A protein has these predicted regions:
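Active-site loop-to-helix "anion-binding N-cap" substructures in soluble metabolic enzymes
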Residues: 1-259
């Protein structure tokens, strides 16, 4: 895809899948079929116990490893939690923040997301901040109203000089893990709206520069049509990122020029 002002990012989200041993097997197969030459930015966000294995395996490549969540606090009595500094020291470049599954299952709020975004940026991580609407919100016609509020709250306190480090992922909740996918036109409409929100909060220059991903059941079959849209700069990939061949096909789709 041709992106004059911004990066194309293909990010995998493994969720709670794969052991360290399975991660090693995946990385071996993945490296063997990675496209040659220049290609888009690629991230693999893996379970915490798999991060060291993934970092070691991808050290000689341009693939960045990321985490699926983090705690906003620097340290302390937070049993079971992982800090941003722990992630950077382990070799992470990215971290997913505010995924709908975290919001729904664990009660994460926009304020929680905001605290994590600020902490991630200060630690040198690239936050992939998620936003999206339920089917009920879409049918009620309040999709952009809801998403605009998520973005405004999530980016509160993020300075002009750091906003371009943030990646925003639009994930229609009704399309995650359901096999349903927003049409390219539906996804484009929302991603364009997200860029408009960033323009209001910051500037046209920053809105042009920020990467907006689509994260609702993108796969190797629909990737090209979604990525051909002018305001969709990549994908946050779930199930398809667990299979090396499928993930590589999405990367290849992102590298194809559009008409």
């Amino acid at each position: 895809m041709n992106r004059k002002y911004r990066k194309t990012v293909i990010a995998g989200n493994w969720k709670m899948n794969k052991t360290p041993s399975e991660t090693k097997e995946f990385m071996t197969a993945f490296k063997a079929i990675l496209p040659k030459g220049r290609w888009c930015d690629v991230a693999l966000c893996v379970p915490a116990v798999c991060i060291p294995t993934a970092v070691r395996a991808m050290r000689e490549t341009r693939v960045g490893i990321g985490a699926e969540n983090m705690n906003a606090n620097a340290s302390g009595a937070y049993t079971g939690e992982i800090s941003a500094d722990m992630l950077t020291d382990a070799g992470c470049k990215y971290v997913i923040i505010g995924h709908s599954e975290r919001r729904e299952m664990y009660g994460e709020t926009d304020a929680d997301v905001n605290a994590k975004v600020l902490t991630a940026l200060n630690a040198g991580l690239t936050p992939i901040m998620c936003c999206g609407e339920t089917l009920e919100q879409r049918e009620a016609g309040v999709t952009m109203e809801h998403i605009a509020m998520q973005i405004k709250m999530g980016l509160r306190g993020v300075s002009e000089d750091k906003i371009r480090k943030v990646v925003i992922a639009y994930e229609p909740i009704w399309a995650i893990g359901t096999g349903r996918t927003a049409t390219p036109e539906q996804a484009q409409e929302v991603c364009e709206g997200i860029r408009a929100v960033v323009r209001k909060l910051y500037s046209s220059k920053n809105a042009r520069a920020i990467s907006v991903l689509y994260g609702g059941s993108m796969n190797e079959k629909n990737a090209y049509d979604l990525l051909a849209q002018p305001d969709i700069d990549g994908g946050l990939i779930g199930g398809a990122s667990l299979v090396p061949e499928k993930f590589v096909k999405i990367i290849e789709a992102a590298n194809q020029p559009t008409e």
